[in-house]
Design a protein with these regions (language model features):
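Charge-enriched, short contiguous segments at helix-coil
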Residues: 79-138
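Amphipathic alpha-helical interface elements
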Residues: 2-73, 81-88
Length: 138
């Protein structure tokens, strides 16, 4: 697929793109559909959607009983899915979808889009790292 944001798909963030088919074959039906929707969001720079779907995908991968997850030990699963970065991503997603107070990127300022783009770049980097760790352990 072709992506439009150079920042989101910089050299550090090409893992998901370069390994799309490999990743997709290890996902269950729920995760696979979310992964497809995520790639569509990346194509069109839908920053909020990228953040929301990336965090959701991490949770689905952890809980959808696929052969790759079933092959991991409890320690490996905790190590991968309970990292500081994964927690940041979940908290960021939750602050978007469960409004409690204004957050960076959604304040109505002219810098909002830049902040959301930066969050999206970080998000894709986190998801790529998690997917890479899972695939290395298979």
């Amino acid at each position: 697929f072709k992506l439009s944001s150079k920042k989101i798909t910089n050299s550090k963030n090409t893992f998901l793109i370069n390994n799309y088919i490999e990743i997709k074959k290890y996902l269950g039906p729920h995760g696979s559909h979310i992964f497809y929707e995520l790639t569509e969001a990346i194509k069109y720079n839908n920053y909020l959607t990228i953040i929301i779907l990336s965090a959701t995908l991490i949770d689905v991968i952890k809980n959808e009983k696929t052969s790759i997850i079933n092959s991991l030990s409890g320690v490996e699963i905790n190590s991968i899915f309970s990292s500081y970065e994964a927690m940041w991503l979940r908290q960021t997603r939750n602050s978007i979808v469960h409004y409690e107070k204004p957050i960076d990127g959604l304040l109505g300022n002219k810098e909002d889009n830049k902040i959301l783009e930066e969050y999206s770049v970080k998000t894709i980097s986190i998801l790529s790292k998690i997917m890479n760790e899972i695939l290395k352990l298979k």
